[in-house]
């Protein structure tokens, strides 16, 4: 029965692993729901800030803030948002593939690229493949605040202010649904204009601003970009938890299939051992 005992030991070991992956799946599902709530809660605030920016920009039409001014693009900055931990399927590898494709496309058109990295996996990746890294941050946890990564954002905003970069983008995983997450590259600076902005350009209310519209615009535009980065980080965390939940569910299901296979092998081994014992008893009786 040595074979049967070994199989039973393997079944016990796999069953313990299955309990762990099942628990991790449930934890990831809970974290994903909480992150989705934070993601939804921040969007109305961001939309309202953008509306205010449009109103203020119209009120101070003679003043063109650098964040809203187009200029010749020679050097591009990109903020890459990744995870700190693994066990989330191909989430990071898909993001890295899209990031490298985007960077190479810019470089083929004669543009230099500066990079800021959020997340430990991104830091490890760019240490391996190289790149001009201006700043990085990791260990943000599952509930980050804007203050946690404001230093990295400020580095890129200062680079834009000083003319070191001429546009700023962010790449992160977009949450489509629980089963689908995809890499997404978004332009942050100069502030892109939507079709709706162009249509409503001549229709606006007149407001009196205190302090001056210029001072407000200088402050609120920076806050808006920080909020855009925050939304990208939170959405990436939601994607991480969704991918982790799916990966752990797959691991749990695979463990269940393995247990069934080993259980069948155990039953066969036990049956063979019993048959052998019966044959020995019958053989011994016949000898008597």
Curated annotation (Swiss-Prot):
The record's annotation in PROSITE patterns points to: ATPASE_GAMMA (PS00153)
Q: Which organism is it from?
A: Legionella pneumophila (strain Paris)
Per the record, its GO cellular-component terms are: plasma membrane; proton-transporting ATP synthase complex
Q: What does this protein do?
A: Produces ATP from ADP in the presence of a proton gradient across the membrane. The gamma chain is believed to be important in regulating ATPase activity and the flow of protons through the CF(0) complex.
**Protein's UniProt name:** ATP synthase gamma chain
**Which InterPro entries does the record cross-reference, listed alphabetically?**
ATP_synth_F1_ATPase_gsu, ATP_synth_F1_gsu, ATP_synth_F1_gsu_CS
The membrane topology term of the UniProt record is: Peripheral membrane protein
Q: Which PANTHER family match?
A: ATP SYNTHASE GAMMA CHAIN, ATP SYNTHASE SUBUNIT GAMMA, MITOCHONDRIAL
Report the principal subcellular site: membrane
């Amino acid at each position: 029965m040595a074979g049967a005992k070994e199989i039973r030991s393997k079944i016990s070991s796999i069953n313990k692993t299955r309990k762990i992956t099942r628990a991790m799946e449930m934890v990831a599902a809970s974290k994903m729901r909480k992150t989705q709530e934070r993601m939804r809660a921040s969007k109305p605030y961001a939309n309202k800030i953008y509306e205010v920016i449009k109103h203020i920009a119209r009120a101070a039409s003679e003043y063109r803030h650098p964040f809203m001014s187009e200029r010749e693009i020679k050097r591009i900055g990109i903020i890459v948002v990744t995870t700190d931990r693994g066990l989330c399927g191909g989430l990071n590898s898909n993001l890295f593939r899209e990031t490298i494709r985007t960077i190479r496309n810019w470089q083929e058109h004669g543009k230099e690229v500066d990079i800021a990295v959020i997340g430990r996996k991104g830091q490890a990746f760019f240490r391996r493949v190289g790149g001009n890294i201006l700043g990085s941050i990791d260990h943000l946890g599952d509930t980050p605040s804007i203050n946690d990564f404001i230093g990295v954002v400020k580095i890129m905003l200062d680079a834009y202010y000083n003319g070191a970069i001429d546009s700023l983008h962010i790449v992160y995983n977009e949450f489509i649904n629980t089963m689908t997450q995809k890499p997404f590259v978004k332009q942050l600076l100069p502030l892109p204009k939507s079709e709706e902005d162009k249509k409503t350009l001549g229709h606006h209310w007149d407001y009196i601003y205190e302090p001056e519209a210029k001072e407000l615009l200088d402050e609120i535009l920076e806050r808006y970009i920080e909020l855009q980065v925050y939304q990208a980080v939170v959405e990436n965390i939601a994607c991480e938890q969704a991918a982790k939940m799916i990966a752990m569910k797959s691991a749990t299901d695979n463990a269940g299939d393995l247990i069934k296979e080993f259980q069948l092998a155990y039953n066969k081994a036990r049956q063979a051992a019993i048959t052998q014992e019966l044959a020995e008893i019958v053989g011994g009786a016949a000898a008597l």
